[in-house]
């Protein structure tokens, strides 16, 4: 083992930083814990927000774990693993990012104690993996046997939004909008849910209580020409993926003109080509045109003359939503325009908000896209509202599509911890200690919840366990200035099961990955 | 540093910045550098091996247990150390696994060589001895190896599991081993002479983050990470005719810059019409071929996209070249590089499914003579799946080589101890100082069980002694169970390695050690970093040709 001691020989490039053995483990674990520590105060209905200021002075105020970690400018490589965990959580299920990060941190903290007790890292890894398996079983058992009606989904959305800065609207109004939005577009003909169909658009001004659900698409666009109608009802819609402009050939072409007549002919030809677009659209009975590319000013004029409302440079994602809302096809050419290529909507109207005009496209024939139009006093308010709503949409979808719901408020975690402890006794070898440590780590979630609510964490935990023992269900319900132990289902605190599963999975994988490292080699 | 110049007034014949290290100093320098490399990876060896976290200058993080990945990412700046890294790379290319073992053995060989050098044994004698031993060791591996039936799935799974233990893929090794063995069996064909040929070109690995590793799956077919070019295209086909196209569906342009002068709008119109007609014609050719799905390696013009969508054809543009090649195997289609000469015969058949959440296409071949499977690996984060992929790739190589080679060995240090004991017997028959080198070689091989024990927190000497005793009793398969610390039949315990990887490890470790030993002079134009050029290192391989014949002497052992 002890190699011959000599002058150390450097085989690595100069400036390379290397730590190994216990010090590498310590440094990684400390970094992981520090990250978890940073977000834990945001957990739960009484969690607080963070204000993050970036290097250019931009301010973000948020309660959302993934956003905090992303903006925190974290450099330590192991800490980045935790950021990744919260990002995966965000991408997969859209919520529970703080939970995942806190759980990873707790798992690392307990791993540190186990390493002190001389448990080999691979044993800890085995134990944690085993415990995660038990946890998944426990989650299975906790899945509530209820029908996912609107009422229940609203509770799920509400649970996700509590503690976030949802402005002066109480969460229940927003939850109603969210659930309705998701239900309206939930499944298309193939039985597939497209998350993009629920769109969120924000606009400052008014108060957040002015938030509304638009059954269609809201575009941040103005008509290309002032003379176009500002509102059209019962309209035929075309969505174009082509330029309404003079066509140019792929080869460079150049007029070589010797007489005035030739010039006139060229100008006339262009003119009639441009008129042709407006005519083709008017003939097809189109009332509103959404174009993802440019529209020549002259064409805009002709369209206005024909009484057609047109928008140019519409974003691809907007065009997609418009197509899904109105049933229109996206056209790359007008030459073979057919009635079936066009869509229909009840109304298109331009509404002014401050200096901006927004186009509301409502009541589409296909009705496959809806927009949550969020209002709020300031930029920061709507931004945070948007994050909360996006998360709420995700959890509602997760509840419908990914296996149902479990009680929230720490109740599921208590059940997991209890199950792991009782099964731990049957596990042979040192692994058992790691399995038990996992139970402790999971309990850190209700503990943090209690702490943030203003309860004594130890008392709360003991009460929770006792109540779970007798009634099989116990969570932390915030009330007044503190909290109490209660039945979360009765009080409507419900989480999608997918969020819990993903948090357990990704926290375990990240923590075990970090525990296995005994050597960190960082290039300059 | 001990780069002392020769005493006396030096005669300077080199550039001012040049550095020169000679004789014992050079040997010492080289050996230490090589050992430092070996030292860096040895803690990753075995089921209780640990991982390394590597951070590059951009701040990108790699977490791995894979020897060759560690060495590649380590930013090594020393000419000798880089030669050792090459050992790992060769091992990876040839055998796909056992890179850590190869490097660790190379380091140990050099350590033992150092002792021999101290006893005034000339490097050429050591090299000859190492060569003899390596030759002999490979013969013995073939002798010890057990022939297996390539259809024995249980055994193949054990081989895959052994390769994965100690890596993060271990946590789901039953599932993954099953997937790997099934994948390899899908692409194995029996040649006329009864040997098995595995074409790993037909196994592709795709990774996806989200969900856990236990939800990884094996798909018969390809996973194409692309979107349709147009939203209105159909994306699900039970039975589609697939066209693979290596020609842009765009207006043809000359390579030379052309500039057309026209005089009237009619002329312009003709150009425009002609261009449109050209696109239309290309689309018509695709339609006429009967294709439902087009994977194009090049671009597709916007207007052509529109026409294709109208015809209800699914088109994907800028498909990766490797994907096209894979699709060719799966669908049985030929790649069309000129639409003018398209025939129905070149189309392949496949079912196409769309995974909206993952934005992927699953393409599955229809028919008997289609080969091609995709291992879809999942893990919670990028780093998890990356490491999973490395582990699975290695296991895949190992299983493939087992099927092709048909020989396996007991792992857990069993083979190394057995080899060492046989080499020691053989050493007695070697005359001259080479005998000592052969013995040193035997000692070096025993590094593997020693490190296995060390990484598991066991006493390495006790373990080694127990193992030696067991092998003395004729228990060829006796290996170390690192979980219990007991010596047991490794084969029965499911620790099975391929003979091919072991042979390669022995061979490349010896050659690298010999290469380093032969050097007695390092001349660097600048300082001794690899920013400058390498020194001389050409001599060693040539010296080995003559040694082959002698190895045969002890063959009947």
From Swiss-Prot, chain A:
Cannot be stably overexpressed. Disulfide bonds: none annotated. Keywords: ATP-binding, Chaperone, Nucleotide-binding, Stress response. The thermosome or CCT complex is a oligomeric complex of two octameric double-ring structures; the complex is probably a heterooligomer of CCT1, CCT2 and CCT3 with yet unknown stoichiometry. Coiled coil: none annotated. It comes from the Archaea. Signal peptide: none annotated. This is Thermosome subunit 3. Induction: By heat shock (at protein level). Molecular chaperone that assists in the folding or refolding of nascent or denatured proteins along with ATP hydrolysis. ATPase activity is highest in thermosome assemblies containing CCT1:CCT2, followed by assemblies containing CCT1:CCT2:CCT3. Not required for thermosome ATPase activity. Not required for growth. Transmembrane segments: none annotated. GO terms for molecular function: ATP binding; ATP hydrolysis activity; ATP-dependent protein folding chaperone; unfolded protein binding. Belongs to the TCP-1 chaperonin family.
UniProtKB/Swiss-Prot annotation, chain B:
SUPFAM superfamilies: GroEL apical domain-like, GroEL equatorial domain-like, GroEL-intermediate domain like. Induction: By heat shock (at protein level). Signal peptide: none annotated. Pfam families: Cpn60_TCP1. GO terms for molecular function: ATP binding; ATP hydrolysis activity; ATP-dependent protein folding chaperone; unfolded protein binding. Residues 539-557 have a biased composition (Gly residues). Residues 527-557 are annotated as: Disordered. It comes from the Archaea. The keyword Chaperone applies. Keywords: ATP-binding, Chaperone, Nucleotide-binding, Stress response. Belongs to the TCP-1 chaperonin family. One of either CCT1 or CCT2 is required for growth. PANTHER family: CHAPERONIN. Molecular chaperone that assists in the folding or refolding of nascent or denatured proteins along with ATP hydrolysis. ATPase activity is highest in thermosome assemblies containing CCT1:CCT2, followed by assemblies containing CCT1:CCT2:CCT3. Seems to contribute to thermosome ATPase activity. Not required for growth. The thermosome or CCT complex is a oligomeric complex of two octameric double-ring structures; the complex is probably a heterooligomer of CCT1, CCT2 and CCT3 with yet unknown stoichiometry. This is Thermosome subunit 2. The gene is cct2.
């Amino acid at each position: 083992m002890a190699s011959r001691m000599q002058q150390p020989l450097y085989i690595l490039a100069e400036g390379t930083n290397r730590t190994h053995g216990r010090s590498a483990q310590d440094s990684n674990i400390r970094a992981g814990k520090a990250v978890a520590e940073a977000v834990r105060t945001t957990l739960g209905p009484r969690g607080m927000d963070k204000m993050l200021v970036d290097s250019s002075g931009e301010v973000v105020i948020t309660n959302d774990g993934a956003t905090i970690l992303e903006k925190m400018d974290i450099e330590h490589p192991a800490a980045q693993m935790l950021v990744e965990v919260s990002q995966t959580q965000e991408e997969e299920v859209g919520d529970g990012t703080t939970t995942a990060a806190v759980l990873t941190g707790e798992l690392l903290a307990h791993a540190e104690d186990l390493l002190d007790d001389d448990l080999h890292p691979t044993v800890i890894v085995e134990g944690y993996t085993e415990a995660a398996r038990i946890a998944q079983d426990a989650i299975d058992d906790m899945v509530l046997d209820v029908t996912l009606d609107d009422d229940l989904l609203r509770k799920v959305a509400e649970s996700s939004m509590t503690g976030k800065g949802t402005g002066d609207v109480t969460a229940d109004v927003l939850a109603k909008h969210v659930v309705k939005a998701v239900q309206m577009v939930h499944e298309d003909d193939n039985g597939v849910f497209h998350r993009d169909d629920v769109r969120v658009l924000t606009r400052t001004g008014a108060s957040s209580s002015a938030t509304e659900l638009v059954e269609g698409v809201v575009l941040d666009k103005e008509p290309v020409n002032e003379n176009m109608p500002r509102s059209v009802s019962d309209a035929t819609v075309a969505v174009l993926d082509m330029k309404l402009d003079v066509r140019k050939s792929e080869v460079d072409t150049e007029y070589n003109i010797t007489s005035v007549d030739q010039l006139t002919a060229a100008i006339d030809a262009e003119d009639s080509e441009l008129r042709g677009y407006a005519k083709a659209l008017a003939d097809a009975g189109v009332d509103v045109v959404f174009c993802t590319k440019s529209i020549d000013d002259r064409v805009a004029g002709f369209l206005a003359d024909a009484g057609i409302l047109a928008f140019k440079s519409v974003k691809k994602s907007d065009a997609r939503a418009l197509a899904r809302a109105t049933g229109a096809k996206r056209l790359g050419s007008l030459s073979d325009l057919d009635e079936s290529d066009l869509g229909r909507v009840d109304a298109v109207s331009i509404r002014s908000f401050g200096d901006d005009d927004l186009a509301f496209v409502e009541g589409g024939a296909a009705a496959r896209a809806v927009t949550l139009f969020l209002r709020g006093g300031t930029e920061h308010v709507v931004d945070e509202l948007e994050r909360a709503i996006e998360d709420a949409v995700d959890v509602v979808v997760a509840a419908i599509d990914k296996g149902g719901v479990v009680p929230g408020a720490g109740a599921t975690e208590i059940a997991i911890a209890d199950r792991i402890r009782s099964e731990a006794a049957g596990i042979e070898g040192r692994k058992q200690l790691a399995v038990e440590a996992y139970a402790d780590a999971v309990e850190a979630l209700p503990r943090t919840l209690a702490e943030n609510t203003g309860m004594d964490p130890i008392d709360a935990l003991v009460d929770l366990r006792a109540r779970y023992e007798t009634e099989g269900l116990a969570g932390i319900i915030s009330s007044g200035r503190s909290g109490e132990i209660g039945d979360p289902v009765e009080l409507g605190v419900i989480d999608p099961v997918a969020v819990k599963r993903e948090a357990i999975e990704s926290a375990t994988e990240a923590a075990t990955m970090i525990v296995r490292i005994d050597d960190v080699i960082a290039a300059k | 540093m001990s780069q002392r110049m020769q005493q006396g007034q030096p005669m300077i014949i080199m550039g001012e910045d040049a550095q020169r290290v000679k004789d014992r100093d050079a040997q010492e320098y080289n050996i230490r550098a090589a050992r430092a490399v070996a030292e860096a990876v040895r803690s990753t060896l075995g089921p209780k091996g640990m991982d390394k976290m590597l951070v590059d200058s951009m701040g990108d993080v790699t977490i791995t247990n894979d020897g060759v990945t560690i060495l590649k990412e380590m930013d090594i700046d020393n000419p000798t150390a880089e030669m050792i890294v090459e050992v790992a790379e060769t091992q990876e290319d040839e055998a796909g696994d056992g890179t850590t073992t190869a490097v660790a053995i190379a380091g140990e060989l050099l350590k033992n060589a150092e002792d021999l050098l101290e006893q005034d044994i000339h490097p050429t004698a050591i090299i000859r001895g190492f060569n003899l031993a390596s030759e002999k060791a490979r013969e013995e591996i073939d002798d010890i190896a057990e022939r297996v039936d390539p259809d024995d799935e249980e055994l193949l799974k054990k081989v895959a599991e052994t390769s994965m233990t100690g890596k993060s893929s271990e946590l789901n090794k039953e599932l993954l081993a099953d997937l790997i063995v099934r994948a390899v069996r899908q692409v194995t064909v029996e040649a006329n002479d009864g040997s098995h040929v595995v074409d790993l070109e037909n196994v592709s690995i795709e990774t996806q983050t989200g969900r856990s590793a236990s939800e990884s799956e094996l798909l018969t077919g390809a996973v194409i990470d692309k979107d349709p070019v147009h939203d209105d295209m159909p994306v699900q086909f039970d039975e589609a005719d697939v066209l693979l196209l290596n020609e842009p569906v765009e207006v043809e342009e000359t390579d030379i810059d052309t500039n057309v002068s026209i005089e009237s709008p009619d002329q312009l119109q003709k150009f425009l019409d002609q261009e449109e007609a050209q696109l239309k014609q290309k689309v018509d050719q695709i339609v006429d071929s009967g294709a439902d799905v087009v994977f194009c390696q090049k671009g597709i013009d916007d207007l052509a996209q529109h026409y294709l969508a109208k015809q209800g054809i699914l088109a994907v543009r800028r498909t990766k070249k490797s994907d096209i090649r894979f699709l060719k195997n799966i669908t049985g289609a030929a790649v069309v590089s000129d639409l003018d000469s398209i025939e129905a015969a070149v189309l392949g058949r496949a079912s196409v499914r769309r995974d909206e959440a993952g934005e992927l296409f699953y393409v599955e071949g229809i028919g008997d003579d289609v080969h091609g499977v995709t291992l879809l690996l999942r893990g919670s984060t990028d780093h998890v799946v990356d490491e999973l992929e490395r582990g699975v790739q290695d296991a895949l190589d190992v299983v493939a080589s087992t099927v092709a080679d048909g020989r396996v060995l007991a792992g857990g240090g069993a083979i190394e101890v057995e080899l060492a004991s046989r080499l020691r017997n053989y050493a007695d028959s070697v005359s001259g100082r080479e005998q000592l080198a052969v013995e040193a070689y035997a000692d070096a091989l025993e590094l593997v069980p020693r490190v296995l024990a060390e990484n598991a927190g066991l006493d390495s000497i006790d373990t080694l002694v127990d193992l030696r005793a067991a092998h003395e009793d004729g228990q060829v398969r006796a290996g170390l169970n690192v979980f219990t610390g007991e010596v047991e039949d490794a084969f029965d315990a499911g620790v099975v390695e391929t003979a091919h990887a072991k042979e390669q490890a022995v061979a490349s470790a010896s050659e690298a050690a010999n290469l380093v030993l032969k050097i007695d002079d390092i001349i660097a134009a600048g300082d001794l970093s690899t920013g400058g050029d390498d020194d001389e290192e050409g001599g060693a391989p040539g010296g080995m040709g003559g040694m082959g014949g002698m190895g045969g002497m002890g063959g009947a052992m």
